[in-house]
Amino acid sequence: MTSTLHRTPLATAGLALVVALGGCGGGGGDSRETPPYVPKATTVDATTPAPAAEPLTIASPMFADGAPIPVQFSCKGANVAPPLTWSSPAGAAELALVVDDPDAVGGLYVHWIVTGIAPGSGSTADGQTPAGGHSVPNSGGRQGYFGPCPPAGTGTHHYRFTLYHLPVALQLPPGATGVQAAQAIAQAASGQARLVGTFEG
């Protein structure tokens, strides 16, 4: 005689509840705890940026670039060199200064050449030659500064104060003066900075 067990809906629901509760128990279930939050480490680049290289510059406290040169620095005044300030990047064996007039009646005229200027930053007062500098004869054969002196009626002349960065010690051709010396300096330079002043003829 076969006996058939008939479960009521209520009994079935009760059994399901017991199974569900058993799965949430402490002994038989997966009770692993969530690990504590650990913030991700941030990597900071501690490398100090290299300082910017000092630029090659030249200026004068007596006149701005493109402005008139005061009379005291011309042949109509005391005819002394204007005060200058300059800076240069590392890597120079020496600096050189050339002052010329491309508007001269007879063609380019070199007024002043100074070689052997100490690299770095520097300045001069009125009438001074840059530290360590040696004057080379200009277009007139004069060793030293000769200021603006354009003939009357020749209009505006532009006087270029050009500072050259020389990577190796300068070797001028024997007897080089004026334009020839200025050209040799320009060819040997690895950089230049320029200040231009004007003077009326």
Curated annotation (Swiss-Prot):
CDD domains: PEBP_bact_arch
GO cellular component term, pick one: cell surface
Name of the molecule in the record: Putative lipoprotein LppC
Gene3D superfamilies membership: PEBP-like
Domain text: Fragments of the mature protein (residues 77-96, 97-116 and 117-136) prevent uptake of M.tuberculosis by a human macrophage-like cell line.
Phylogenetic lineage: Bacteria, Bacillati, Actinomycetota, Actinomycetes, Mycobacteriales
Native organism: Mycobacterium tuberculosis (strain ATCC 25618 / H37Rv)
Stretches assigned to coiled coil: none
Main location: membrane
Lipid moiety-binding region (N-palmitoyl cysteine): C24
Topological relation to the membrane, as annotated: Lipid-anchor
